[in-house]
């Protein structure tokens, strides 16, 4: 009789341990499945935020002839958004640093973006401004000067700048999206 009680208690204890182990195992499996789903359905991604601004006065636009070998040619001024900085403050700062002009009330008019090989996104917020103060001056980014808007297509534009220019000029467009197709960069204007 005592033997049967010990055996029953021992089996009960074993069953409890097995039950708890099974619950932990099932919970762990469900947790792993949850994490896998969360990773594949992630709503966040790594993004580099930058800006570019078309500063204009009448039929003239301010251009920057970039000297950076990685991205050289005619563009508009702009640069990176710093951590904790508002987008508008960033474009005002960048235009000032690269041109000496302090723009007033820049208007967001579109975006340019693409996905890098590492899966991160690069996003350029596009602004327009026609009010500014200050004296025009060059920076280490390159020479800045006024050009006739109509002459821009004949100038040596930086890579993919012609599509971006269309977003600046056409109110029906809001995005210049670059993507890889069969190993070649393609462009989609939306």
Feature-to-residue mapping (PLM):
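NUDIX/MutT-family hydrolases
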Residues: 128, 137-169, 186-189
């Amino acid at each position: 009789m005592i033997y049967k009680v010990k055996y029953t208690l021992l089996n009960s204890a074993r069953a409890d341990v097995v039950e708890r182990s099974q619950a932990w195992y099932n919970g762990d499996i469900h947790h792993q499945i949850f994490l896998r789903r969360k990773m594949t359905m992630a709503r966040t991604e790594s993004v580099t935020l930058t800006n570019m601004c078309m500063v204009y006065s009448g039929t003239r636009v301010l251009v920057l002839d970039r000297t950076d070998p990685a991205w050289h040619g005619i563009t508009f001024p702009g640069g990176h958004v710093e951590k904790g900085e508002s987008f508008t403050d960033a474009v005002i700062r960048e235009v000032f640093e690269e041109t000496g002009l302090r723009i007033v009330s820049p208007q967001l008019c579109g975006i340019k973006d693409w996905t890098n090989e590492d899966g991160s996104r690069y996003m350029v917020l596009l602004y327009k401004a026609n009010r500014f103060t200050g004296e025009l001056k060059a920076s280490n980014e390159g020479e800045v000067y006024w050009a006739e808007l109509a002459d821009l297509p004949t100038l040596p534009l930086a890579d993919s700048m012609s599509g971006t220019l269309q977003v600046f000029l056409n109110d029906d467009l809001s995005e210049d999206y670059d993507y890889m197709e069969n190993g070649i960069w393609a462009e989609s204007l939306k």
